[in-house]
């Protein structure tokens, strides 16, 4: 959906927020994105090593793959991986000025109590996040998050 939106709205920056489990289930999307080559497309994957939306089960083999390498292998040359939030914040401002597609893997710590706060409230929490981010120049699209 994010790719289609970026192709339909080429003058609008499109930011897709994704989970690592969701991307693993749809790896072919990276090749499709690379082939379409949208200049206004940024794909951020939150890599916490669990299938979040199905109960935070650990992802099998989570230490054996590297999303940045997978994205590069799929043809997305501008692929980055961050495990430090401060460095990511500084670099992200610079990346916003680059042509896409841009792929970013952001390693985050999975908080075991996080899922409990979301159970039954996903729609409400997503609404709050969207409201918080409104006014940003980026069009936000939540996929598999």
PLM regions: where:
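Thiamine diphosphate
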Residues: 1-47
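General beta-strand structural signal in soluble alpha/beta enzymes
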Residues: 16-17, 80-83, 106
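Short glycine-rich anion-binding loops that position phosphate/pyrophosphate groups of nucleotides
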Residues: 21-22, 49, 108-111
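Active-site-proximal loop->helix
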Residues: 26-36, 53-70
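Conserved beta-strand scaffold positions in the cores of enzyme catalytic domains, especially
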Residues: 43, 79-81, 103
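Short active-site-adjacent structural elements
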Residues: 52-54, 91, 111-116
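Conserved thiamine diphosphate
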Residues: 58-94
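Glycine/aspartate-rich loop-and-adjacent alpha/beta segment that forms the canonical ThDP
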Residues: 97-145
């Amino acid at each position: 959906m994010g790719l289609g939106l970026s192709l339909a709205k080429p003058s609008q920056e499109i930011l897709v927020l994704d989970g690592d489990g969701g991307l693993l289930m749809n790896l072919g999307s990276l090749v499709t994105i690379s082939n379409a080559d949208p200049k206004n497309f940024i794909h951020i994957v939150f890599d916490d090593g669990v299938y979040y939306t199905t109960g935070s089960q650990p992802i099998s083999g989570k230490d054996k793959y590297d999303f940045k390498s997978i994205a590069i292998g799929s043809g997305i040359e501008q692929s980055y991986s961050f495990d430090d939030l401060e460095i990511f914040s500084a670099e992200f401002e610079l990346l916003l000025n680059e042509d896409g597609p841009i792929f970013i893997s952001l390693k985050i710590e999975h908080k075991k109590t996080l899922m409990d706060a979301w159970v039954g409230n996903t729609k409400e929490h997503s609404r709050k996040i969207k409201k918080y981010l409104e006014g940003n120049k980026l069009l936000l699209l939540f996929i598999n998050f």
